[in-house]
Curated annotation (Swiss-Prot):
Pfam families: PetN (PF03742). GO terms for biological process: cytochrome complex assembly; photosynthesis. InterPro entries: Cytochr_b6-f_cplx_su8_sf, Cytochrome_b6-f_cplx_su8. Keywords: Chloroplast, Electron transport, Membrane, Photosynthesis, Plastid, Thylakoid, Transmembrane, Transmembrane helix, Transport. Component of the cytochrome b6-f complex, which mediates electron transfer between photosystem II (PSII) and photosystem I (PSI), cyclic electron flow around PSI, and state transitions. This is Cytochrome b6-f complex subunit 8.
Length: 29
């Protein structure tokens, strides 16, 4: 894998994780 692919993969993971935190926070978990 090249650097761009790794950067995109990391960005998507962080984005998905932050979205999950927002959803869980609104649900009171």
């Amino acid at each position: 894998m090249d650097t761009v692919s790794i950067a995109w993969a990391a960005l998507m993971v962080i984005f998905t994780f932050s979205i999950s935190l927002v959803v869980w926070g609104r649900n009171g978990l």
